[in-house]
Amino acid sequence: MSDVICGGWTKTKKADEQTQKICENVKNQVEEEPQKNYAEFHAVEYRSQVVAGINYLIKVHVGGTNYLHLMVFHKLPCNAGQEVVTGVQEHHHKDDPLVPF
């Protein structure tokens, strides 16, 4: 039997090339509101949820001991297939769990 619950979040997985690409695509959106420029912006791990598109919850290393948790919605191809940042949490650490917010 599968551990996946329809509409539920996956378990935390190690980030891959696709996750890093999503981070690169949304980096400007993340930097806009706090007007910060992150020299480092590396996806570490993520969770996902299939809805009318895909929600991603991504842990991003931004330098030193600093991490962000990002909520990103990836639209379906019929809706332009773009990624939109729907939430950012600052002041996280390496061992903080990814909890949907």
Regions found by a protein language model. Name each.
Residues 1-101:
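N- and C-terminal low-complexity/disordered segments
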